[in-house]
Amino acid sequence: MDNKKNIIVGTAGHIDHGKTTLIRALTGRNTDRLKEEQNRGISIELGFTHFDLNNNLRVGIIDVPGHEKFIKNMLSGVCGMDMIILVVAADEGIMAQTKEHLDILNLIGIKNGIIALTKCDLVDKEWTELVKLDIADEVKGTFLEAAKIIEISSTEKKGIDNLKDEIIRIVDTLPEKDLNSNPRLYVDRSFSITGFGTVVTGTLISGTLNLDEEILIYPSNKLTKVRNLQVHDNNVNIAYAGQRVAINLANVKKEDVPKGSVLVPSNTFTESSLID
């Protein structure tokens, strides 16, 4: 087993407030995958990457789209997140999708987070303090009420080390991942690769998932097998709860396992139309 502790951090916030740029400053990678995203300068699909903090911690990053038209894509990525970085640009402050993302995260029960005040190099100190007061007022009564607000300039790399330190501090308070329950994965991407077939990605919520394991797809009730298994672009024989996982599935079409599907071992879960 990989000795590193695995956690998932998501971003949230209004369009063009610097989520993708912040992640590039943290990881050195660009999470805008699609040509359309590169051309338009906005995130449409979920973006994924990772980086290591010290010798013991691997942080998976989910970069969610901020534009209102792509809010359903944002929703598909929030399952399995250990914490959120709410990104607010200092030159604009709280905006429509900031509030919308905050409401969604609060409703689904996210418990931990950090507020990244980006683009601080574009405004003076007095304006920064006013925006921080506005943010504090907006997050009152939410899971971010006591969250630290970290001033950042991604282009100048200012505040990045402070952000990493706060991630480590929060991780130290998180419970250990549940490796003993049945594996469960919510699909947030589904696509086909020529020569390989259907591939899905998601965060493994609980348990462990093995190469060649037989699993069931809900709600399509299709039985399939794990043909290939990757964690952070590396082929593995077993994946553990808390890891970002890509799975090559045998004998199913991508239409059989759309975004939002759940992968579990057969005869372990039951479908329901009720929510408690």
Feature map (PLM): residue ranges:
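Conserved Switch II/interswitch segment of TRAFAC-class P-loop GTPases
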Residues: 57-58, 64-69, 79-130
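Conserved catalytic-core segments of large NTP-driven translation/proteostasis enzymes
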Residues: 137-276
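Short, ordered loop/turn segments at secondary-structure junctions
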Residues: 14, 67, 89-93, 118-122, ...
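Signal for well-folded cores of large energy- and translation-related assemblies
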Residues: 27, 31, 35, 39, ...
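Residue-level signature of catalytic and energy-coupling elements of molecular machines
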Residues: 16, 22, 41, 61-63, ...
